[in-house]
């Protein structure tokens, strides 16, 4: 018969962008994770990334990937593409 690999169930990875208001301006943060809900909770507490501590964050963008390496590559691109980040931020703030 057909054998399937044993192990944990498949979990996709996400690239996400967060937005927070800080000293009267909006700032963004880009990251990747395989548990978006848990990661947002960590960012909104003292256990998040150093940059995100002490601020309240909202997810304004997310994209799903099948592998960690794809997510890491996309995260790197989004972190460096300030024009795209500004567009995502502007589109969210228009709502």
Residue ranges with predicted function:
Residues 1-55, 59-62, 70-84, 90-95:
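GIY-YIG nuclease catalytic motif and its immediate N-terminal context
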């Amino acid at each position: 018969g057909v054998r399937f690999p044993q192990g944990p169930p498949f979990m996709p990875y996400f690239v996400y962008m967060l937005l927070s208001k800080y000293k009267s301006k909006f700032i963004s943060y880009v990251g990747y994770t395989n548990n978006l809900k848990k990661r947002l909770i960590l960012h909104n507490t003292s256990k998040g990334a150093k940059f995100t501590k002490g601020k309240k964050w909202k997810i304004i963008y997310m994209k799903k990937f099948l592998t960690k390496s794809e997510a890491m590559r996309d995260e790197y691109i989004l972190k460096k593409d300030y024009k795209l980040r500004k567009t995502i931020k502007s589109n969210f703030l228009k709502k």
